[in-house]
Amino acid sequence: MLFADVVGFTKVTEDLTPVFVEKFLGGISEMIKKLSRAPAFVNTWGDSFFAVFDDLDDALNLSMQLRDYFSGDTWSELGLDDGLEVRISMHAGPVYEEFDPVLGRRNFFGHHVNQAARIEPIVLPGSVFVSEIMAALLSFGHDDFDFEYVGNLELAKNYGSHPIYILQRTGYKDSI
């Protein structure tokens, strides 16, 4: 699972909201089209994005593409001199796929969805944080990606303390 949230979204003025939506959701849509398989589920709300994947490689690739998309000059037309940054979290685990009568479509629920969502608010802007489960999955056959232990961090909304790692492409160095 992948959660993403835009840091600094509240600085976008109301009249530029349509530009933001076009760039943010339009950009994600284009990235999804380039994946080998579309996510099993996606949802958006405002400046947030949630996706459930059947394929770990696609989830990893989308997380890096999304991170890099925000590091470019895509956001200058929004009048933000310092741009926007994204926080991305990833976690894996069994979830419930159920019909959501409010949305009128299937949705995903459960402890692991909640844990993925609770990691996202603590992510350093411009970074991808992953759970220990994701780091373990990356250890087997995913040589294009590296992870580094960040610490045993307190998750948002009193969700407890969990081992967290930063995800990056192999050979990419970023200061934590």
What spans do the regions from the language model cover?
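Catalytic core of nucleotidyl cyclases, primarily class III adenylyl/guanylyl cyclases
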Residues: 33-58, 73-111
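Intrinsically disordered, glycine/charged-rich C-terminal tails and inter-domain linkers
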Residues: 125-176
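A generic structural signal for short hydrophobic patches within well-formed alpha-helices
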Residues: 9, 59, 95, 134-135
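Solvent-exposed polar/charged
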Residues: 34, 121-122, 140
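Residues that scaffold the ATP/ADP-binding catalytic core of kinase and kinase-like folds
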Residues: 12, 52, 98-99, 137-138, ...
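Catalytic NTP-binding/metal-coordinating core of nucleotidyl cyclase/transferase enzymes
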Residues: 1-65, 69
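Active-site phosphate/pyrophosphate- and oxyanion-stabilizing loops and adjacent acidic/basic residues
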Residues: 117
